[in-house]
UniProtKB/Swiss-Prot annotation:
<keyword id="KW-0999">Mitochondrion inner membrane</keyword>
<keyword id="KW-1133">Transmembrane helix</keyword>
<comment type="subunit">
    <text>Homooligomer.</text>
</comment>
<feature type="coiled-coil region">
    <location>
        <begin position="168"/>
        <end position="269"/>
    </location>
</feature>
<dbReference type="InterPro" id="IPR008839">
    <property type="entry name" value="MDM33_fungi"/>
</dbReference>
<feature type="topological domain" description="Mitochondrial intermembrane">
    <location>
        <begin position="311"/>
        <end position="447"/>
    </location>
</feature>
<comment type="similarity">
    <text>Belongs to the SHE9 family.</text>
</comment>
<keyword id="KW-0496">Mitochondrion</keyword>
<dbReference type="GO" id="GO:0007007">
    <property type="term" value="P:inner mitochondrial membrane organization"/>
</dbReference>
<keyword id="KW-0472">Membrane</keyword>
<keyword id="KW-0809">Transit peptide</keyword>
<feature type="region of interest" description="Disordered">
    <location>
        <begin position="84"/>
        <end position="132"/>
    </location>
</feature>
<feature type="transmembrane region" description="Helical">
    <location>
        <begin position="290"/>
        <end position="310"/>
    </location>
</feature>
<feature type="compositionally biased region" description="Polar residues">
    <location>
        <begin position="348"/>
        <end position="361"/>
    </location>
</feature>
<keyword id="KW-0812">Transmembrane</keyword>
<keyword id="KW-0175">Coiled coil</keyword>
<protein>
    <recommendedName>
        <fullName>Sensitive to high expression protein 9 homolog, mitochondrial</fullName>
    </recommendedName>
</protein>
Length: 471
């Protein structure tokens, strides 16, 4: 038969083993805290640590105060086990298990708090706060917002500066003065009406009292004590009514004088404002006239600059370009003359004689056909002579032939040119000027024509205005 101490140790060891195997299987976070109920009847004949069987797992977010109280209670519960004489190794093992569970709970609690703290800044940054949006705005956007906020004040300040420069600020001061005087006139007229009403009431009171006094005097022989007292009261109040009537009359006169003064001052201010506005409008009109004359002067100056400097330069450039083209054409003609056989002198002379007239007047298609037929006839008539001359002058150099042809050419005289220019030619020229044929014009030429027309129109209108003002 086993002894009692040995049985007690065996039961205690089995209880500790059960608590050790049950602790790792439990989760560090319990779904709900288990209430600790220690009844008095829970003790057995042999002492077993109830804390080892029903261990309380604290929640992750419990306070440190509750933890300290739980640890104190655990110590109190574990004290009887020590008193019963259990070995130290068995007592140290439950304490180690409790420390492990508390450490794991603390680490989980701290990790949860750190994760919560890490989640909070991300949610605030990604939440679109006004400060976050303001920091992401560009500098240009901020400047534009500031400029738009100050736009109304800037416009007001600019208008005020313009009024100061033109002298309209004094007219605005007169306007404000006129508004104040209008208010003063309305108040004066209101006082006049009030004084009239008070004066009329005083007159009515005095007339009523006098009428009653007269009625009492008519039946003086039949006065009663009440009538005597009433007569005495009315006689005493008659002087008061007279003084009140005089005072209201004086107040009415003063109010009427003030109203008349306010009306006169208002009329004077209105007249001065009208005069100042007329002077200001004349000043602005004069300034606009001088501005118009200035613009006209600028237009005339530009016109003179174009006519004196730009137009000669443009003409020189055109002439130079035309001369270059003519020289190129002459060079090409010389090359062709040297490369081809030289025609007879008479034929070249006839062509040179016909060329100026053809250059002056543009022939019609019928004239071209007739000239071609006549040239063919002359060529056919002169073929035997030209062949003979070619055979005779075969030994002559091309340079001598060209020099002789140039010497034989004579330019047409002025009389022949004038005779060729007839009325029909002038009519054709006018018809060409008024025709609807397309013309290529550069933008500069159009600008020059527009500026010239504007300057001419401005000059003409200035002369007309000057003549009208002088008359």
């Amino acid at each position: 038969m086993q002894s009692m101490p040995w049985l007690f140790r065996q039961s205690l060891r089995t209880g500790l083993n059960l608590s050790r195997t049950s602790l790792p299987g439990r989760s560090p976070i319990s779904p709900a805290p288990i209430s600790k109920v220690h009844s008095k009847t829970a003790r057995r004949n042999f002492s077993v640590c109830l804390r080892c069987h029903f261990r309380y797992q604290p929640s992750l977010r419990s306070d440190e105060i509750k933890r300290s109280t739980d640890e104190k209670q655990d110590k109190k519960i574990e004290e009887p086990v020590i008193a019963l004489g259990a070995p130290e190794s068995t007592q140290a093992e439950p304490n180690a298990g409790a420390q492990d569970t508390s450490q794991t709970a603390d680490t989980v609690h701290t990790q949860g708090q750190e994760g919560k703290k890490e989640d909070e800044p991300g949610s605030t940054q990604n939440g679109g706060l006004p400060s976050y949006i303001e920091d992401r705005r560009s500098q240009f956007s901020k400047q534009f917002t500031t400029w738009m906020d100050n736009l109304q004040s800037n416009v007001f300040v600019a208008g005020q500066r313009l009024n100061d420069l033109t002298g309209y600020s004094s007219i605005e001061a007169l306007k404000r003065n006129i508004q104040e005087q209008e208010k003063r006139l309305r108040a004066a007229r209101h006082r006049v009406r009030t004084a009239k009403e008070a004066y009329a009431a005083a007159i009515n009171r005095r007339s009523t009292s006098q009428r009653e006094v007269n009625e009492l005097l008519q039946r003086k022989h039949a006065w009663s004590p009440a009538d005597l007292e009433r007569f005495t009261h009315l006689y005493r109040n008659d002087h008061t009514n007279e003084v009140a009537e005089n005072e209201t009359q004086e107040a009415l006169s003063a109010a009427e004088r003030e109203s008349e003064e306010a009306a006169a001052s208002l009329t004077k201010s209105i007249l001065s404002r009208y005069h100042e506005e007329q002077v200001w409008s004349d000043k602005i009109r004069r300034m606009s006239t001088w501005g118009t004359w200035g613009l006209m002067g600028v237009n005339v100056l530009l016109f003179l600059i174009f006519q004196i400097a730009v137009e000669p330069w443009r003409r020189k450039r055109l002439v130079k370009g035309f001369e270059e083209k003519v020289l190129e054409a002459i060079e090409k003609e010389k090359i062709l003359v040297h490369s081809q056989p030289v025609p007879p002198v008479e034929f070249t002379a006839t062509q040179d004689a016909h060329s100026p007239t053809s250059g002056l007047v543009t022939p019609s298609p019928g004239d071209n056909i007739a000239s071609e037929e006549s040239s063919e006839a002359t060529v056919a008539a002169n073929t035997p002579t030209t062949t003979a001359e070619d055979e005779a002058s075969g030994s002559m150099a091309p340079e001598n032939i060209t020099s002789s042809s140039l010497e034989s050419y004579k330019p047409p005289s002025l009389q022949s040119l004038l005779s060729s220019m007839s009325i029909e030619c002038c009519r054709q020229y006018i018809h060409y000027l008024l025709s609807e044929s397309p013309v290529t014009v550069t933008q500069r030429d159009i600008s020059v024509v527009a500026a010239t027309s504007a300057a001419a129109g401005a000059t003409l209108m200035g002369l007309v205005v000057a003549l009208i003002r002088s008359q």
